[in-house]
C-alpha cells in the first residue's frame, strides 16, 4: 500500500501528554519519532508500542521510529502483534534513518511514500544458475557415454557382419542331384552333390529342392537354399534349425571339411589322454611311452569293465610318418593270412573256452597257484595278442593285395591294427603250441575262470577289445585279447610287463620283467585228467597238454609246462652281453636246434612247426623265429650251477645240467631260437636260472628220480598272502600218434620212453658234442 502523507514532526515528549482536551492534529499527518538511548531515558513515560498507539489516536496515518540508538525497540513493537494497530508503524536505522532525519530537520514539509512488502524467508532463496549448470554437465556426460556405447555397438556389429560374411564365404555349397544320378567324391571324402535320399525340402521356404539347385551346407551339416539361408546367416549368424553359431565355428579356426571333424574328435580324446609305458621283449634299454586314448568302454563276460585304448595317430597318414620307435625297423612284417604266411598247419585251433556260468571272477595274487595250463592257441592268436594297441603303426608299411588286407575280425569287432595292410611282430615272440583234439585237455578251468595267455610283455592297463569270447579260427589273427586283460579296474600307468594281465601290478625288486621262464599256469579242475593222445581222434602232429608232475614238500604250486614261455618274477636272473657264454648240461635222446653266435646252425633231421610243433618235411626259412621241443645238446662250456632249468637269451636258449636238481635226462624244454642276431651291440641277452629252495631241492631230486606223478615243481617261492589256491594231483604227457617222432614224458613211474627217430636225433647230437660230457646215455624203454 502506497500513500502520500504529510509529514509532521513531533517531539517524543509530545506523545507523553495525556491531556485529552488538547486540540487534535489534522488527519493525514505522519509522526516521526527518534528514539533515544535507553540509558538516557531511564523512566520513559510510554513504551514504544504505547507511543505508536498515542500517535494513531491523535490522527497520524503512520508512525516512523528511528531505532538507530535503541535497536531493542523492535522487540517492544513485536509485543503488540496480538492487538495490531490500525495504522502502519515503520522503524528505520542506518543510512536511511540519517537521510530521513536530515529531511525532517531542514524542511518544514516533505512527502514520503511507504511501500509494504512481506519479509523474505531464508528457504526461498534458490540459485537457478547452479541448478542449470549442474544439469547441463550431467546431460553432457550422459550424452557422451551414449555416443560411445552406440559407436562401440556399431563397430562390433560391423565386425560380426564381416566375420559372418567371411564365414559364409568359407561355407561349402553343393548342388542338388535327383535320385539315381551319380555323385562324385569330394576332396575330403565328402560329396560335392547331394542326392534326394536325404531331406529334399528347404526348412525355410518349405520348397523341395530342384535338380541342380545350389544349396548352402552349414558346419552343423544342415542344408538350405542358398538364397534363403544367406540373409538369415548374415543377420543372425546362427543355423535356423539348431541355432549353431557360425561365428563361433569360425573363431575356432578349424576349417571346413573332414579334417575339421577328425580334429574335433581328437580334441575330445585329448581330454582323456593316457600314457602307456611299453617295453619290447629282448630290448632292455629301449623302452618308450605310447600315447593312447580311450575310445570305448564295455563290460566283459565276468562283469569287469574293458576299455579300448587307441594309439595317437596323425590326421593325415600321408603327410605325417608313423610314430614308430626306430629300433623296431629291423622286424619283418608277419601277415595274418594263412595263404600269405607260408605256414600250412593241419592242426585244429579251437576258440577260447567259455567260463562256466555263475562263477565270479576273482583277481588273485601272483604266486603261481590257481592258474591254469596255458591254452594251446595258434600262433596267429598268440603273437599278436599283447604287442599291439589299436591304431598302433609299425614300420615296413607294405601293401598286401586281395583278401590278405585286414582280415583280423573277431566276433564282429575289428581288431586289426593297420600299418599298411600288415601286422608287425616285435621279437622275440613266444609261440604257443597247437591244441589237442580234446577240447578239455587245453581249456582253462582255473578258480577265477580267467583265460590267461602267457606270452610276451603286457602293460597292466586296459588296452584290449571288449569281445566277450574269442571264436576266430586259425586263419584269423587276433590283434588284441579282451579276456587276457579283463580286469581293467586298475587302469594305472604302473606297468607290469608280464605275460598275464591278472598278475598284481607291482614294480618291486622281486620282479624282473626282462626274464622269461618256461612255466605256464597249471590247469585246475579237481583232477579231471584229459583223454590220452590216442583218444578223441587226435590228428597228425597233435600235441596234448596235461597236468604237470608235482614234487613233495615244495613251497610253491607252480606247474612246469612246455606250452609257452612266460616271464619269471622271482628267479635268479642275470643280464649278460650278447657275447657272454652260458653253460649247459648233457641232454641225450632229444631233437637239437641251436643257433650259435658265430652263425653255425646245428639241427636234427627234422624241425617242428613254430606255432604248433608239427613236424615239417621241408627246411623252413631261416628268417623265422621258432620254438623247438626237446632238450638242448650238450656244450663243452663247463658245468652249470643249477640243473634241469632253462636259460633264455635273444640268440640261443640253454639248458643247464639236468642231473643236479631235477636230474632227469629226458625232461623236455621249449627251445627258442632267433636266427637273426640283434642289430644293436648294446642289447643285452636275458638268461634265466631257476633256484629251488634248499628244502625242496632234495625232495624234487628224489621225486624226479622216481618219476612220481602229481607233484608240483617249486619255481616261485610261496606267497603266504595268496588265498584260494587249488591243490590237485595230475600228470603231464606229450604224445604223438602213428609214426610221428616226439618225446613222451613221464606219466606213471619211470617211463621216459622215446621214439626211434628221437633216439636217432639224440645219437646224432651226441656225435656233435664229441667228448664234451660223459655218463649221460639215452634210455630206451618200451612204449605203453
UniProtKB/Swiss-Prot annotation:
It is found in: Cell membrane. A zinc finger (RING-type) spans 202-243. It comes from the Eukaryota. One of its GO terms (biological process) is limb development. It is an enzyme of class 2 (transferase). E3 ubiquitin-protein ligase that acts as a negative regulator of the Wnt signaling pathway by mediating the ubiquitination and subsequent degradation of Wnt receptor complex components. Along with RSPO2 and RNF43, constitutes a master switch that governs limb specification. Pathway: Protein modification; protein ubiquitination. Gene3D superfamilies: 3.50.30.30, Zinc/RING finger domain, C3HC4 (zinc finger). Belongs to the ZNRF3 family. One of its GO terms (molecular function) is ubiquitin protein ligase activity. Pfam families: zf-RING_2, ZNRF_3_ecto. The chain crosses the membrane at residues 129-149. Keywords: Cell membrane, Membrane, Metal-binding, Signal, Transferase, Transmembrane, Transmembrane helix, Ubl conjugation pathway, Wnt signaling pathway, Zinc, Zinc-finger. Its EC number is 2.3.2.27. This is E3 ubiquitin-protein ligase ZNRF3. Residues 765-784 are annotated as: Disordered. It is a single-pass type I membrane protein. It catalyses: S-ubiquitinyl-[E2 ubiquitin-conjugating enzyme]-L-cysteine + [acceptor protein]-L-lysine = [E2 ubiquitin-conjugating enzyme]-L-cysteine + N(6)-ubiquitinyl-[acceptor protein]-L-lysine. CDD domains: RING-H2_ZNRF3. Residues 150-784 are cytoplasmic.
